């Protein structure tokens, strides 16, 4: 097994840049890809998944699957569908296996929020994405008193690509696409 690991990080200035990143990411993914999202509440995991769905061209209506654990979003075109999982309440591999993600993995892109340490056994290649608002934000008030405007704060996007699917060429193409989307969104915002 090829355990190629490549990494990069960049700042996402606000939610529109986060959305541009997600859309570019979705456009690069294909059936069989596994994406593990990590970050505190309000870090932008669901926002990133929603825009990733736009890039994949799947049916709208992506919301956090907190209470149902997994939601399926079919493709509107020729591409793969999206399986969106919230693994927060799942304890381990056994709990994950009850969702039977193996049966949809080959035909879909699978995005798992809170999945680190729980879903890596599903495939030998994956993307691990960490979204962190705290790394860039100045301390403000009480964390439980989160104002709506604080949701639009900058966040640090860190991506780790693991396995043979993300060889040097595939990773370089992914990274270039993501950074180009961020740069284009920043340029657009400057001209508005």
Where are these regions (language model features)?
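Short phosphate-coordinating micro-motif centered on Lys-Gly-acidic
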Residues: 2, 6-8, 102-192
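Phosphate-binding P-loop
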Residues: 26-31
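Short hydrophobic/aromatic beta-strand immediately N-terminal to the Walker A/P-loop
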Residues: 34-36
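P-loop (Walker A) phosphate-binding loop of NTP-binding proteins
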Residues: 38-40
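Conserved lysine of the Walker
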Residues: 45
């Amino acid at each position: 097994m090829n355990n190629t690991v490549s990494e990069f990080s960049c700042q996402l200035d606000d939610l529109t840049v986060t959305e541009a990143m997600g859309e570019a990411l979705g456009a690069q993914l294909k059936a069989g890809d596994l994406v593990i999202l990590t970050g505190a509440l309000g870090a932008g995991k669901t926002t990133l998944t929603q825009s990733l769905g736009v890039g994949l061209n799947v049916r709208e209506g992506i919301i956090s699957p907190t209470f149902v654990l997994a939601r399926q979003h079919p493709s509107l075109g020729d591409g793969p569908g999206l399986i969106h999982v919230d693994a927060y309440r799942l304890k381990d591999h056994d709990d994950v296996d009850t969702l039977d993600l193996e049966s949809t993995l080959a035909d879909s892109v699978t995005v798992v929020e809170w999945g680190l340490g729980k879903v890596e056994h599903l495939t030998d290649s994956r993307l691990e994405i960490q979204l962190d608002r705290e790394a860039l934000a100045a301390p403000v008030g009480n964390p439980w008193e989160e104002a709506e405007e604080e949701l639009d704060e900058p966040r640090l996007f860190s991506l780790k690509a693991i396995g043979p699917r993300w060889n040097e060429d595939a990773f370089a193409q992914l990274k270039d696409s993501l950074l180009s989307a961020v740069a284009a969104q920043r340029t657009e915002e400057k001209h508005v």
